[in-house]
Amino acid sequence: MSGLRISLDDLESDSDDSAQMTHQVLRLGEITVSAEGLTTSMGYKYGLSPDDVVVSATGFLGQGSSGSVRRATHRKTGEALALKEIKITSQAHLQEIRRELETLHREGNNSPYLVGFYGAFCHEGSVFIAMECMDGSLASVRKPVPTEVLASIARSILRGLWDLHRNRHLIHRDLKPSNILFSLDGRIKISDFGVSSFLECTRANAHSFVGTLTYMSPERLKGESYSFAADIWSFGLVVAELALGRCPFTEKLARANSSTEAGFWVLLQHLSSDGPVIVLPPTMDSALADFISACIQKDSQSRPTCEELLQHPFITNAMKDDDKHVIKEWLLLMAMQAELIPSSAERETPLMTQSGATASLNLDDELSKLVR
């Protein structure tokens, strides 16, 4: 394993005693992370160390809000992991690590709609977080997504958000397609909690400015206080992007010439105007259009909650089949249309390896090629 070769004692600290660095040990509130793994103040321990994982040399999975993610394997069990490395170069990184670890520890193994958590450890100036390895993100799927499939995806995301909002009092603050993961068996899970924020009650508000600009709500762009409705805005834009096949603000942001500051002012000016947030095509399913419009109301108080959205006709009128089944069948159809796997008639003839030996069809491998 590789990492930034620095001593944690060399880093600057601030007055926040909840995040302390001593040699290769991090004390983050109720959580302590060392080379031997993660422990909590309540005595819970995740026994995971650098020697327990084998990192794939070619398994780069993506870039999160605060670090890179690679595919790895647990040495003893052979289980696939997504290993996120966060190089510690500032006190701000420690706060991100604390937020993510606290959320993963408390929620990652308690909800089927949040990515699972296996442990964390320190190594050579970095913190490594081991999570459930999914097969791709919504940023990588072919778009536009069919309406009935989109309803199943949206329902799964809403159930994850509902768990964060109602049961955990957490605002995700960085909901976007790349932070919503899927597995080839049709599961949808929310990930990347490095900028999430805890609210003591459901009527509280947050104030800090973090997250991805494109999916940020008007109240957040304006520097106003915000609450769970900010996530609903981001969710609405994610659904719109999957339905339209592109980010709704792509053309407007193109004028910013890749400048974050210019993009900020372009979006702020657009969302402060009297015009519509986005113009949906008249051919769009009416229930879907109404669903998206409800999520992206400029007035945060006018946006529905997750619970209310789960009762919207776009969701309730969708196919009653199991959401996992609907999503899995869609992934299979995409693969077949891309001719990455043979049709049912062709499957009667065994596939051949380069050496001429008979091989079985590995559907998961073929689907993985499609979405990467």
Label every PLM stretch briefly.
Residues 85-109:
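Conserved N-lobe beta3->alphaC-helix segment of eukaryotic protein kinase catalytic domains
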Residues 120:
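Activation-segment/catalytic-loop signature of the eukaryotic protein kinase fold
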Residues 124-137:
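Conserved short submotifs of the Hanks-type protein kinase catalytic core
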Residues 153-154:
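Activation segment signature within eukaryotic-like protein kinase domains
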Residues 58-64, 69:
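Protein kinase glycine-rich loop
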Residues 231:
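Conserved catalytic-loop aspartate of Hanks-type protein kinases
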